[in-house]
Design a protein with these regions (language model features):
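Conserved structural position within tetratricopeptide repeats
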Residues: 29-32, 65-68, 102
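Short N-proximal segments of mature Sec-exported proteins
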Residues: 3, 40-47, 53, 57-68
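Start-of-helix register in tetratricopeptide repeats
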Residues: 1, 5, 37, 58, ...
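Structural signature of tandem alpha-helical TPR/SEL1-like repeats
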Residues: 17-29, 53-61, 88-92
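Hydrophobic face of amphipathic alpha-helices that form TPR/SEL1-like repeat modules
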Residues: 3-12, 16, 26, 41-48, ...
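Terminal, low-structured helical/coil segments at or just beyond the last alpha-helical repeat
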Residues: 72-110
Length: 110
């Protein structure tokens, strides 16, 4: 939870200099521990390209995981971004989410 809170601070420049790459690093650490809010925010970073290279497949994967872990925005955002993706990319993202989840977040597409 602390990693997630610090990531939000980095993303928004609250009490620290704004640092999107730093936020992404912390979101990823929290996301890999199953934090659904961090998974959602990491997906937003992938979708927007803030702090890393834009990647809709990775965004879809993390939103899928966030949704599975109880973050309602994850499902909403996943479905929205899917409208701009090919079926092949959606299938890839779903398979990656399954592998990530089944590996206890050890194999998450990077």
């Amino acid at each position: 939870k602390a990693q997630y809170i610090l990531a939000v601070m980095y993303e928004n420049g609250e009490g620290v200099s704004q640092n999107y790459a730093g936020a992404v690093k912390l979101y990823r650490l929290a996301a890999e521990q199953g934090n659904a809010e961090a998974q959602n925010n990491l997906a937003v970073s992938y979708a927007t390209g803030k702090g890393l290279i834009q990647d809709y497949v990775m965004a879809h994967m993390w939103w899928n995981l966030a949704n599975a872990n109880g973050n309602k925005n994850g499902g909403i955002n996943r479905d929205r971004i899917a409208e701009d993706m090919t079926n092949a990319d959606i299938e890839k993202a779903v398979a990656m989410a399954q592998e990530c989840f089944n590996s206890a977040y050890a194999k998450c597409g990077y």
